[in-house]
Regions:
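Alpha-helical transmembrane segments
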Residues: 11-15
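C-terminal motif of bacterial Sec signal peptides marking the signal peptidase cleavage site
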Residues: 17-20
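Bacterial N-terminal signal peptides that target proteins for export
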Residues: 1-9
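Subset-of-secretome marker
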Residues: 23-161
Length: 161
């Protein structure tokens, strides 16, 4: 009985070591204009070069012309309504007097990049994901995704230590 217990403890310890070896990393990329800022935050498995999640944060500065500010809010709300029921996607909104924003969190375990029904329902989301999430070898590759968005002038933000 003691041998079984000792063996179980050793095997359990080995399992925890293997689980701890997963090399999860995070990278942030920003594209900024005079009126907007888009931030992509990737969480990825460094060893497998596989994206685990993508968070897209969009902030748009509002015009002082009320009609333009209202039109911007309406466009954002249309996008949110398209996206809100897609599996693996969580969305949050922010609203202020000078800027509005929204954050889209994509869980790659649940999100279906090649689902025709979801693509038809939320074409704007999938157009963005086709830029930010690049498949390579039957998985969403971080290195291929990074290369693609850097060509579009997204700048990687280095962590300050």
């Amino acid at each position: 009985m003691k041998r079984i217990l000792k063996l179980s403890i050793v095997l359990l310890g080995a399992l925890f070591v293997l689980l701890g070896c997963r090399s999860e990393s995070k990278s942030v990329f920003v594209f900024q204009t005079e009126n907007s800022k888009i931030t992509y935050t990737y969480v990825y498995d460094k060893g497998n070069d596989e994206v685990l999640s993508l968070t897209t944060d969009v902030v748009v500065r509002l015009s002082e012309v009320q009609e333009l500010a209202t039109a911007t809010r309406q466009k954002r709300d249309e996008l949110v309504n398209q996206i809100k029921d897609i599996e693996g996607v969580r969305i949050t909104l922010s609203d202020g007097a000078k800027a509005i924003g929204f954050t889209i969190e994509i869980d790659m375990k649940k999100f279906k990049l090649n689902d025709p029904e979801s693509r038809a329902k939320a074409p704007s989301l999938y157009q963005t994901m086709d830029i930010a999430l690049i498949k390579k070898d039957d998985k969403v590759s971080f290195s291929a995704s990074k290369e693609n968005i850097e060509r579009l002038e997204f700048v990687e933000q280095k962590e300050e230590k």
